[in-house]
Amino acid sequence: GVGGFHRAHEAAYLDRLMRRRAGSGPGGGAAAAAGGSCLEWGICGVGLLPGDARMRDVLAAQDHLYTLLLKHPGGLRDPAVIGSIHNYLFAPDDPEAVLALLSAPTTRIVSLTVTEGGYNVDDATGMFRTEAPGAVHDAEHPGEPTTAFGYIVEALRRRREAGIPALTVMSCDNLPGNGKVARTAVVSQAAMSDPELADWIDGNVAFPSCMVDRITPRTTRADVAELRRALGVEDAWPVVCEPFTQWVIEDDFPAGRPPWEEVGVQMVDDVVPYELMKLRLLNASHQGLAHWGRLLGMEYAHEAAADEDISSWVRAYLEREARATLRSVPGIDLDDYISTL
């Protein structure tokens, strides 16, 4: 999925890396000399749903470029043109083109941004919903998939038959253990039609978990108009987001990966401590803002954040209660993290 969050997060990180390695960013010359060009990496977006046709049309008209507009406190705007997406395939137009792309040796990572509910996994049981219409269709017609997992399974079947190494499937959705959830979805979809293939996938495909963070509200007409008025930029679908961003990834990429750590991504052995930190500090404080603000008759989050009483309650929760439940998190100063929040 190539929605707002993907374009504000993964695509933005890769764009920064490409610019750095090309010598146009801070330290770019030294980085390029040390590691060579990073322009071998790029993103080809894939849209599966009928509504994704508009993204196809907008990106094609703009040579797959778009504006990322960071909104700072106080109203400062910080725009950047993102160029890491080099193509976009709308699956209903040409399913075979998508399968050919996923099956190609040059494709080494398939990232997923399909929302928390897009994995067809039951929250209560952790089991794949084999009765879902899309799953049933893709099991009965594996060569004509309609779901993300049907496409991935068919592509992996082709790679296996052609002797092409397996790739990495990386979930970038905001749910705990997203790599495990992605593994469940892909392996279970394969098992519905080819148990032997499912075993091969389970043993050969990497499914690293990662923690993602960047508030990215839906782009409005007002955002488009503001960009046009303030900067003279005509962008049919810019992305607006907060300045803060974080990405923590389990370093399990047998087929290779971009050197994301050069642009602030934390590559770790285990993402769980970072997930707990985010859930208990960031997510819980957001929930506190919402509940306390609502009880005090406020309508918007920024009103709650500006209230001195609520701010003191949130800080007390973070420093006195939540922090005590967390062990040390590698590479993170929890006091600094709390201050940032």
Please tell me what each predicted stretch does.
Residues 1-341:
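Substrate/ligand-engaging "lid" and interaction regions
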